[in-house]
Amino acid sequence: MQAIEKLFKLEEHGTTVRTELVAGLTTFLTMAYIVFVNPSILGDAGMPRDAVFVATCLIAALGTLIMGLYANYPIALAPGMGLNAYFAYVVVKGMGFTWQVALGAVFISGCLFLAVTLFRLRELIIRGIPHTLRSAITVGIGLFLAIISLKSAGIVAASPATYVTLGDLHSPPVVLATLGFLIIVTLDRLKVRGAILIGILVVTVLSFFFGGNKFHGVFDAPPSIAPTFMQLDILSALKGGVLNVVLVFFLVEMFDATGTLMGVAKRAGLLVPGKMERMNKALLADSGAIFAGSLLGTSSTTAYVESAAGVQAGGRTGLTAVVVAVLFLACLMISPLAGSVPAYATAPALLFVGCLMLRDLVELDWEDTTEVIPAAVTALAMPFTYSIANGLAFGFITYAVLKLFTGRAREVHAMVWVIAAIFLFKFAYIGGH
């Protein structure tokens, strides 16, 4: 006990071992759904689901463990929602790249991320991007997740006349997915920990009776990670056509992870002005996890906002994160259950997370059209072009041009001009996806 006290400085942070254990369990329950959702999404890109399941558990455990031991922060890491969907449905299925090349793009973005963190450039870049565009990126990814989830559940379907139309509302997947979404929202409103996880499991159990799904068991030895381990194609990812993908991964990773880390740390009272040493360690842990995740075989890893649930339960140190890491390692034994989860069981989770991401709309300045219009264009272009990259491109270009045309070019940070120019060059000479 004394060793734990000394390592995590529990007394200094006003917490106890018991409180940290409860906080760790709380955080885990709120984000454990990722071990089911991530293999489902990346599996649609042709990746071996069992191997992705192992990679997801391992990188969540490794990244969170480093966060706890190195930064002493009660923050958990795992493959991020949104970027996994972009990886699977846009980069691989839409743009035609292999998943190995997509992993290579994640690796390169992770290296860039690590470099800007080591050289303390991250804060400079973050400050250079307008707050409205940062908020719009979150909203756009939320809408992107929504359209993917509705399609996975069968609630919407393709239509040559109207582009999209209503699916078969009498089919078991649609009924079960709708029920799962209502369960998640209800449990969340009642402040039940693990609402998303419970919703996924309930729909999965019902699918055995009403959805024609087969039960493969619950516990077994972990499957092999060999099909995805070190399978990334870095050389192909360095080609010009993948620059667009790398830029998207890099920008979203940076905004999402930095915002989450600072938000949760602030809520825990760990963000002290002028003392950024621990935060910089947390940023390094986050950057390193992206790098390692691509080697194991999963999309970009990020800090989870669900960590706030553990902070709310009293978590204040890295011991909370260590507990989460141990629980993710334990998940390696439930691979048969993960393989039994159908796409329409994870669809409600995607839709719920997507809905929550729309809350950033309230942060937009609706009185200034040079701010809100680029934000709206960014958010709307993502689902309607089925591409996060296009949303970013249209948003940055629109922002720069509107400020220029209205005589407010001086308000535009140099970083915006650079990113807008890169996207313009890409559209003019490479084409768009």
Where are these regions (language model features)?
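Membrane-interface helix caps of multi-pass small-molecule transporters
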Residues: 40, 65, 69, 90, ...
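Hydrophobic/aromatic residues within the transmembrane alpha-helices of Major Facilitator Superfamily
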Residues: 25-32, 62-65, 69, 150, ...
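Juxtamembrane transmembrane-helix boundary signature
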Residues: 60-81, 112
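Loop-to-helix transition at the N-terminal end of transmembrane alpha-helices
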Residues: 46-65
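Helix-coil boundary and interhelical linker segments in multi-pass alpha-helical membrane proteins
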Residues: 40-52, 90-101, 242-243, 342, ...
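Helix-loop-helix junctions within the multi-pass membrane cores of secondary transporters/permeases
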Residues: 2-38, 59, 80-138, 266-361
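Membrane-embedded alpha-helical modules
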Residues: 95-209, 322-433
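Helix-loop-helix hairpins and the membrane-proximal interhelical loops
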Residues: 1-51, 164-166, 197-280, 424-425
